[in-house]
Amino acid sequence: MSDFKKILVANRGEIAIRIMRAANEMGKATVAVYAEEDKLGLHRFKADEAYRIGEGMGPVAAYLSIDEIIRVAKESGADAIHPGYGLLSENPDLVDACVANGITFIGPRAETMRALGDKASARRVAIEADVPVIPATEVLGDDFDAITKEAAEIGYPLMLKASWGGGGRGMRPINGPKELKEKVLEGRREAEAAFGNGEGYLEKMIIRARHVEVQILGDKQGNIYHLYERDCSVQRRNQKVVERAPAPYLSEAQREELCELGRKICAHVNYECAGTVEFLMDMDDGKFYFIEVNPRVQVEHTVTEEVTGIDIVQAQIMIAEGKSLSEATGKASQYDIRLNGHALQTRVTTEDPQNNFIPDYGRITAYRSATGMGIRLDGGTAYAGGVITRYYDSLLTKVTAWAPTPEKAIARMDRALREFRVRGVSTNIAFVENLLKHPTFLNNQYTTKFIDET
């Protein structure tokens, strides 16, 4: 397979810019797509070419139109499409459309995506691969008598989860049978609106849980590497707030066990490209339970890049071109991948912590970001004069701090956040600063409920 000359990025905001930067460094031209409501988005201007999509479709529907993405790819002469995260990144129909039109999809095969992108079928894969899973139902039907019976068999408390997509959408904690029907219907509506598919299932809720995930890369020759783990336990309403690599509370034996579990699942389906295998860790007994596989690049991939030195997006591109993992990572084998230091990422958003984190909109009248040793910024519309609209998510920029130790990385992140000056819209910066100083966080005693219960 020949190297790509032009890559269309089927996304927007910071991840589109991140992908374009990776492609630029490799000498590849880039193509952006943008909805009318997103015409001032920086990703449009970062690309070598930009095309408007989705006339009359709406601000999000435009980015979800496979026909429009393929149309622009053909018009622009792009030979590959990178989906980023969110939007169409987990839709196997886009992969099929790429194959039908002679365009390479930078990501897993469609059959892999169908097996792993749906959380319910991913559970079956995990069970086949002899990886522990949390007790759960199959995909729920419409018979609420049957649902009530299944829920009672597993036992409360339960978590309703959407089969497709992520980001906390469609998820609902259910503490008892009186809440069951209302929460299931509520979660279905939210999942349908977010992903176009309302399917969901019930899962036993682990009370004191950590959220850890393993970064995987697989090539077309059948090789699988892991890039170690990330801790994503600090969440608010199932949305990640702080991500870390490596997880500071794991022993070397636990780290080895966890990473091998992640590798086993991906090896079982001959996984290609980048993926993340997510687990819950029970703090009381140290056991790991499979949650899902995200068949795409993650928002928090930056922390793994900082501690391994491997550019995950460039690796995705090279794997899609047919190159081996050793070529894509610069590492001859799994044993050559070493952890170096500690990194954490925080997400600066235009949410107002003083008003129940409601997203704020408007024009940024002043903007100054952090800089200095060990600080990395991945931003979208983060500049003075930029307009934050109500149509898209509230992420302003991602801040990643690296240092030799967790303590120094946290101190560096705190310093960086204090350097920010944002006027015109509210941000969550003060909230994150306080979080980083909390004794529970500093002592590594936090669970996934840390923020919600503090």
Mark where each language-model region is.
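ATP-dependent carboxylate activation and anion-phosphoryl transfer catalytic cores
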Residues: 2-3, 8-26, 30, 50-52, ...
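ATP-binding N-terminal substructure of ATP-dependent carboxylate-amine bond-forming enzymes
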Residues: 1-129, 141-149
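Acidic/histidine-enriched active-site and ligand-binding environments that engage anionic O-linkages
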Residues: 149-159
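Conserved beta3 strand of the protein kinase N-lobe
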Residues: 136-137
